[in-house]
């Protein structure tokens, strides 16, 4: 005979589970923390219409018309003039390094041709490795072409009809002329996949030993903490490298992503990036008490990496505090490296700042991992 539902017994089971949740503070913190992080990031940090994009001006014509055009650019809210270049080489270098999103070239004799009604052309070069970041700003250029300089040209007898703009704006999408989204997504996908898999797999490394009861055997082995750490990490470096090669081949063959730079340089950068993620995973494995906690910590690290690195949303569209957090994440710098090498043909000089940032992260994460492992030994 089946017993009827007892509210007393049900209440006892509920209290038992709540007590278990209260004791497992790590899991409880993840249950509360991850939704809060999602709320904050999606509510405040995500912006698909970035403003104040860094812009460099290269002007061979110093006139009131040039200054008025520059002011019209800034007034749209999409362009922030951060530098004035002295040569075209400087413009190319700033675009390649990712220091600016736009480069505006005003030709010589611009004001003279303007007054003569010859409709001079202004060249606007956009770093189109992230099409979403530049889309709205490029659309704003059409309004500038129609409205800018209209007040300055009042009273000037122009040979061109009033219905036509006094000058043309030629937009050149650098590194991605056809505005293909896959050129932005696929190189970044390599970093996202490596982050997700390597942090999780390594995060389970030590916790698996603890759950199986073989942790004591590992601690009794006559090996140094660094040797244990390398022994746990190096097999996954090989696995991660195979993943990266498969993704790179698929990017070139299936999606037609160009490979403008050195594959060897990208491979070396990928190894450093993998070590950074493996160090994070090893740190989590020394903190987590079980494999569930290790997986939860992985998502706790992966979610900000995915949203704040510039993979899904424009990095420059985020507020300063979100960009600061993003700069501390290795995925942010690897995305710049991968896109820079594949799409821009960047060399070691251009990617060195991002390599340095990843190396600094490796040193800090490895130091924390070794310190935590020594505590485990004690």
Regions found by a protein language model. Give the residues of each.
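Long, hydrophobic alpha-helical segments
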Residues: 182-202
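Extracytoplasmic/periplasmic domains immediately adjacent to an N-terminal transmembrane anchor
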Residues: 1-183, 350
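Junction motif at the cytosolic side of a transmembrane helix
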Residues: 205, 283, 342, 357-378
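Transmembrane helix segments
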Residues: 33, 41-50, 288-328, 332
């Amino acid at each position: 005979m089946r017993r009827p539902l007892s509210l007393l017994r049900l209440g006892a089971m509920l209290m038992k589970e709540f007590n278990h949740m209260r004791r497992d503070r790590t899991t409880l913190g993840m249950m509360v923390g991850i939704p809060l992080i999602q709320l904050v990031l999606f509510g405040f940090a995500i912006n698909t219409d970035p403003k104040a994009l860094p812009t460099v001006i290269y002007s061979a014509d110093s006139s009131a018309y040039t200054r008025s055009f520059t002011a019209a650019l800034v007034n749209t809210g999409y362009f922030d003039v951060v530098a004035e270049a002295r040569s075209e080489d400087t413009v190319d270098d700033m675009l390649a390094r990712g220091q600016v999103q736009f480069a505006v070239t005003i030709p010589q004799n611009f004001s003279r041709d303007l007054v003569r009604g010859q409709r001079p052309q202004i060249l606007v070069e956009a770093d189109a490795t992230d099409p979403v970041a530049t889309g709205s700003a490029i659309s704003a250029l059409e309004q500038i072409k129609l409205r800018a300089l209209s007040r300055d040209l009042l009273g000037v007898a122009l040979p061109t009809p009033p219905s036509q703009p006094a000058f043309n704006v030629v937009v050149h999408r650098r590194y991605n002329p056809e505005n293909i989204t896959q050129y932005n997504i696929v190189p970044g996908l390599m970093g996202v996949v490596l982050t997700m898999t390597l942090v999780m797999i390594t995060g389970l490394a030590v916790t698996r030993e603890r759950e199986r009861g073989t942790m004591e055997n590992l601690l009794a082995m006559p090996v140094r903490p660094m040797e244990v750490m390398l022994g746990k990490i190096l097999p996954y470096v090989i696995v991660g490298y195979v993943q990266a090669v498969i993704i790179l081949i698929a990017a070139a063959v299936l999606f037609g992503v160009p490979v403008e730079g050195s594959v060897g340089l990208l491979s070396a950068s990928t190894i450093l990036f993998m070590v950074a993620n493996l160090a994070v995973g090893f740190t989590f494995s020394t903190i987590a008490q079980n494999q569930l906690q290790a997986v939860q910590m992985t998502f706790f690290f992966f979610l900000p990496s995915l949203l704040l690195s510039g993979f899904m949303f424009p990095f420059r569209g985020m507020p300063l505090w979100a960009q600061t957090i993003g700069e501390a994440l290795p995925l942010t710098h690897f995305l710049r490296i991968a896109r820079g090498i594949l799409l821009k043909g960047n060399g070691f000089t251009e990617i060195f700042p991002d390599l340095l940032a990843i190396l600094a992260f490796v040193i800090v994460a490895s130091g924390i991992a070794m310190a935590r492992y020594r505590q485990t030994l004690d």
